[in-house]
Amino acid sequence: DAWPEDTRWVYDNALKRGYHALSVQCPGQGMAIRVNGLPFRYDWENVVTPIVDVAVQLEGVDPERIGLMGLSFGGYLAPRAAVFEKRLKVCVANPGVLNWGESIRIGLPPQMSEAFEQGPEAFDAVVEQMRAHSALVDWFLRDSVWKHGVATPYELIQEFDRCDLTDLAGQIEAE
């Protein structure tokens, strides 16, 4: 959910250690969202597989030693891709998030949790009250709703609910 340049320190250090590093701007990130309007998608394997298709064609890339690292929301996205993209031999998830929606809902204040159970109108009304008192909450919600291609905070939580690896994590073959 950031620009690739934000994690340049990772790639610089990988290169110093003899690794190849490929940094891309995927849906929900950088120019993909800002210029092309491509929001995040929960089925990240559909983003990663074409990238791996290109990577294995690059000179010097060992197709038996391809890894994927995901930071922040990538802590869900990278393992999701690894479930389906079997050419990935290593997957780093920081933080490793099994169920993004659940992890968000657990952190909600009781007032918001109760409103969520009541439905979209109640939840969005409570969120609007919070936004009015916090520039940080307002920015986070505007940014997240936009990057995930939804219209409301309630829809954002529903979108996060799609990001669930509970029944899929056992299928990851990457280390």
Question: Which residue ranges define each predicted feature?
Answer:
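Alpha/beta-hydrolase active-site loop
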Residues: 38-67, 77-80
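Serine-hydrolase catalytic machinery in alpha/beta-hydrolase-like enzymes
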Residues: 29-41, 102
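Conserved alpha/beta-hydrolase
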Residues: 14-32
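Helix-rich cap/lid subdomain of alpha/beta-hydrolase
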Residues: 100-142
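The serine-hydrolase catalytic nucleophile loop
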Residues: 2-12
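Active-site nucleophile loop of the alpha/beta-hydrolase fold
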Residues: 26, 92-102
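Short glycine-enriched nucleophile-adjacent loop
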Residues: 69-86, 91-93
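Serine-hydrolase catalytic core
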Residues: 132-175
